[in-house]
UniProtKB/Swiss-Prot annotation:
Part of the ABC transporter complex BtuCDF involved in vitamin B12 import. Responsible for energy coupling to the transport system. SUPFAM superfamilies: P-loop containing nucleoside triphosphate hydrolases. This is Vitamin B12 import ATP-binding protein BtuD. Belongs to the ABC transporter superfamily. Vitamin B12 importer (TC 3.A.1.13.1) family. It catalyses: an R-cob(III)alamin(out) + ATP + H2O = an R-cob(III)alamin(in) + ADP + phosphate + H(+). One of its GO terms (molecular function) is ATP binding. One of its GO terms (cellular component) is plasma membrane. The keyword Transport applies. It comes from the Bacteria. Pfam families: ABC_tran. It is a peripheral membrane protein. The gene is btuD. It is found in: Cell inner membrane.
């Protein structure tokens, strides 16, 4: 276990919720808009104060200084664009600033792998202000993964993503989830707020379903994402079908 959250809360946006996160685990927070997903995962970053207690790698999260946190975890908030103009490669280099002198060849190998996975290799010399929304989001994802890539940052343990698929098309989204699974296979725990319930059903190891600031249920995708619980939480009709050995959710008006 790398993280233990007890009675995490920021009333009224988030009421007390407790959960644990293991190394290499992919955890999805799902729920309607305003349910508390972003609030919950933002508190795991150590940048926002609230109620409750978070133990991270055996130590209270509040006891870490920011440079230590920057080496151990990365937090990608919802899409924003800085007010300065730099090339993409320069922006990506900023994600390495907190690391302890990683080897140049290891950094280059990690950069090549991540950029190829997200199909942004041809964007490295572009100015970030000239990128489309989807291109910019992929650059942000690349920077986040680079910061906690184990081969160049052995202290890394946690990647926190707030709605990372925003602005991505279906092919780019598929590539992102493949990269997230690659991170998890290297032992990085990935925590994310997500709206694509079919992706959560397929990709998550653990799910927390939130509504009106409260955790309705938590557990495996099959236990949490029942038709009854989804219909009650999202106030819409839901069907769950099997297609080619895979469960799919269909939402009816």
């Amino acid at each position: 276990m790398i993280l233990d959250a007890k009675n995490l809360a920021m009333p009224p946006r988030l009421l007390p919720v407790s959960f644990t996160i293991d190394a290499g685990e992919i955890v999805h927070f799902i729920g309607p808009n305003g349910s508390g997903k972003s609030t919950a995962i933002s508190m795991l970053s150590g940048l926002f104060e609230g109620q409750g207690e978070i133990t991270f790698m055996g130590q209270l999260l509040s006891d870490y200084d920011l440079p230590s946190l920057a080496r151990m975890r990365c937090y990608l908030s919802q899409q924003d664009r800085p007010a300065f103009s730099v090339a993409v490669y320069h922006y990506l280099a900023l994600s390495l600033s907190a690391l302890n002198n990683p080897r140049v060849d290891h950094v280059q190998h990690a950069l090549d792998e991540i950029c190829q996975a997200l199909n942004i290799t041809d964007k490295l010399n572009r100015n970030i202000q000239t990128l489309s929304g989807g291109e910019w989001q992929r650059v942000r994802l690349a920077a986040a993964c680079l910061q906690v890539w184990p081969a160049i940052n052995p202290e890394a343990t946690l990647l926190i993503l707030d709605e990372p698929a925003a602005a991505l098309d279906i092919g780019q989204e598929a590539a992102m989830y493949k990269l997230i699974r690659r991170m998890a296979e290297q032992g990085i725990a990935v925590v994310m707020a997500n709206h694509d319930l079919n992706r959560t059903l397929r990709e998550a190891d653990k799910v927390l379903l939130l509504n009106n600031g409260s955790c309705v249920v938590k557990g495996s995708p099959s236990d949490v994402m029942t038709v009854e619980q989804l219909e009650s939480t999202f106030a819409t009709q839901v069907q769950r079908i099997e297609h080619e050995g895979r469960s799919c959710l269909i939402f009816n008006d």
